């Protein structure tokens, strides 16, 4: 009898203690185009939304060959506000006139993905319903990466998308507050600059 009680108790704890993340329903393209938010969005907003979603999908699937285009490689390091202790990145940028090279991004994608906080940006875009992105110019989400919590906001105006990332965990292992700005070139979002706050 005790065995059954402990089994039930363990199962009960397992279900109650697991994270209850709200599931964001992904709409098909057809469903999305039928929403009020999509119908009421301006053509410019639809274009910016489309580029933002393409960026997120490439980040999610880790399309290493496409990411240098988004980062506008070769990109000057001061425009990225990049002061890294990572020797692979530092050696590469010093050898490339202090620019982040295309080869570095493709050859060391996971390193760049985490070092440049693309993981936080990816999770932020993913966690916001598409209809909210279409209906609002400024949206926000809380993102957890490992043991670190971040409050992220996405501001979409004209042809610009800004990501404002604020650390909610007072821990030296967590990323510092920063702001990213991407500008649409009519086809994709291209990094304008990144600024540590």
Summary of predicted features, one role per range:
Residues 114-197:
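Exposed beta-sheet edge and beta->alpha loop/turn motif
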Residues 2-8:
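Sec-dependent signal peptide recognition
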Residues 20-57, 61, 69, 79:
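Short, low-complexity N-terminal intrinsically disordered segments enriched in polar/charged residues
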């Amino acid at each position: 009898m005790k065995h059954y009680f402990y089994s039930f108790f363990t199962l009960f704890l397992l279900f109650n203690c697991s994270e209850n993340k709200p599931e964001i329903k992904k709409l098909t393209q057809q469903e999305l185009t039928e929403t009020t938010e999509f119908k009421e969005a301006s053509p410019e907003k639809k274009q910016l939304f489309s580029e933002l979603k393409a960026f997120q999908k490439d980040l999610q699937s880790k399309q290493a060959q496409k990411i240098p285009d988004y980062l506008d490689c070769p990109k000057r390091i001061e425009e990225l506000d990049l002061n890294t202790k990572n020797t692979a990145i530092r050696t590469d940028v010093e050898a490339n006139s202090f620019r982040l090279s295309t080869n570095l991004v493709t050859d060391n994608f996971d390193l760049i993905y985490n070092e440049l906080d693309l993981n936080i940006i990816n999770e932020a875009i993913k966690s916001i319903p598409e209809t909210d992105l279409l209906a609002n110019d400024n949206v926000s989400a809380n993102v957890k990466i490992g043991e670190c919590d971040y409050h992220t906001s996405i501001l979409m105006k004209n042809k610009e998308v800004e990501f404002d990332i604020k650390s909610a965990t007072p821990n030296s292992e967590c990323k510092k507050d920063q702001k990213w700005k991407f500008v649409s070139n009519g086809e994709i979002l291209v990094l304008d600059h990144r600024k540590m706050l």
